[in-house]
């Protein structure tokens, strides 16, 4: 599941959604009960007025805290690793601790930061955002050192100033104990750029991908196979295997007509700017992200832009068909979100999950 800790309001259509820890924990506990394997939330650093709603919880802390109130689900904390700067010892110690708290159910989503305003919030001068590919080089060096701290049996010394990658931290006789319980925690990143794919192929176990064709399920099914093959091949060249996950919003009711009416009601409640329906009220900050370009390509069939990277709309049978189609083209898993999260998640569990089990997509 893909949680909403940022209080993003896609539409004025009524919803129970809340940014609060209690609401999101209830969603994760329901997902845990249904047998979902993974819970995750994005993280953003925006100035006043940058969010649709009133608040944004820290995803690193919130997902880690959920470990004490869940049983089986894996919890993925998001962290911008280049803001601060972050020292490898901090991340290694925090990660090992959360690994023990969760009994091996914790992992980290590595984010390098694509918005200029976020880099400036942490002290970069205007125009001082770290160059796109350089960010991945710096993050890779950080993860190399963190992995060493998790694995080494002796003290570690390292000087990043000598590598020329742009990091400025040093370690002299560094040591982290206890080590993670079951080896290295799961590492995740979201990307669509060549540099991001190269990073994922070296470090990640899971990569969150986006549809090159935009949000409509037909365009996604048409354009994703080549994208998936590129990512898998990059990992295979390094004798690694990585899983690809995509983020659909599931809009479902008992009948196709009811589901379409629900999706239309969400769309009609979207705010407008200059007569054009927009996604929530978020401002358009300067970003060099490359993963969402498909939404701007008019040659592809576009969706309603009501949440998620792609949209799965329909009756339970239709939703199961679309998830099965994603599986057939090579998607390893889906990180689902919902407009009215908890009620819609319960609908998924009671009406759609049994169909996926019948098709061998769930156990």
Model-flagged regions — what are they?
Residues 87-119:
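Hydrophobic or amphipathic alpha-helical targeting/insertion segments
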Residues 1-72, 180-185:
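N-terminal beta1-alpha1-beta2 module of alpha/beta enzyme domains
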Residues 22-43, 199-210, 325-331:
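Catalytic domains of carbohydrate-active enzymes, especially glycoside hydrolases
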Residues 8-22, 79-89, 129, 181-194, ...:
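Active-site mouth loops of central-metabolism enzymes
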Residues 38-60, 211-224, 336-349:
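Glycine-rich, proline-tolerant flexible connector loops at the mouths of alpha/beta enzymes
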Residues 31, 35, 66, 98, ...:
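Conserved, mostly hydrophobic/aromatic
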